[in-house]
């Protein structure tokens, strides 16, 4: 039997204006406390996704249109460790399922797909920031809270105040997550390419 709601993995460069509009409508419905955040674009701390995992419900009728019912975006961040090693990591953003389709396992399927794709692209780690009530959900999926501080920085090298203040990580290979405090940057801010250079040499 065919999956009634198949998952799609879309690179940002194939998401046209129509799909982008539907995604933003979905995000606005799922995050009503941020009504203006997705009005014009899908950007998380000044970065667009590298790819997005979607679930769409096919609309019936000649004039119908597909409805986005599930979404996970993956933005590429650079994490810098105490020892000044830098890694590009897959940052999970906008995990959301339309209200009528929650508690069906779609969120878990989308996150798994997003991590599989990050692994396929060569990333060593995935990171996310979530609110405290969601920590048990992610822990059940193998995510871990960091033992040390994680600070995200903006383009002016000022720390960003995070509304979702529980940093978590997943190891995508057998390489352990770096120990000690971690800084999170826009890749270009610290001289890393968004696409490629999954692991850099030590920065002197």
Annotate each language-model stretch with its function.
Residues 2-3, 10-15, 30, 119, ...:
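Terminal substrate-recognition subdomain of acyl/acetyltransferases
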Residues 9-96:
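A conserved beta-strand-loop-helix scaffold within acyl/acetyltransferase catalytic domains
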Residues 57-61, 100-101, 171-176:
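Short loop segments at secondary-structure junctions
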Residues 97, 103-116:
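Conserved acetyl-CoA-binding loop-helix of GNAT-fold acetyltransferases
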């Amino acid at each position: 039997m065919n999956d009634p709601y198949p998952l799609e993995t879309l690179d940002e460069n194939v998401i046209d204006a129509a799909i982008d509009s539907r995604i933003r409508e979905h995000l606005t419905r799922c995050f009503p406390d941020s009504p203006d955040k997705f009005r014009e674009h899908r950007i998380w701390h000044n970065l667009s996704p590298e790819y997005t995992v979607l679930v769409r419900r096919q609309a019936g009728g000649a004039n119908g249109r597909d409805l986005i019912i599930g979404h996970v975006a993956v933005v590429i961040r650079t994490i810098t460790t105490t020892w000044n090693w830098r890694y590009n990591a897959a940052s999970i953003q906008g995990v959301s399922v339309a209200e009528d389709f929650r508690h069906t396992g779609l969120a878990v399927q989308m996150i798994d797909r997003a991590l599989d794709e990050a692994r396929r692209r060569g990333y060593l780690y995935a990171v996310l920031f979530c609110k405290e009530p969601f920590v048990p959900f992610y822990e059940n999926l193998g995510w871990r809270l960091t033992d040390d501080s994680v600070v995200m920085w903006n383009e002016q090298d000022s720390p960003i105040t995070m509304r979702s203040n529980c940093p978590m990580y997943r190891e995508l290979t057998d390489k352990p997550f770096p120990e000690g405090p971690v800084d999170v940057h826009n890749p270009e801010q610290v001289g890393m390419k968004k696409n490629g250079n999954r692991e850099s040499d030590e920065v002197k």
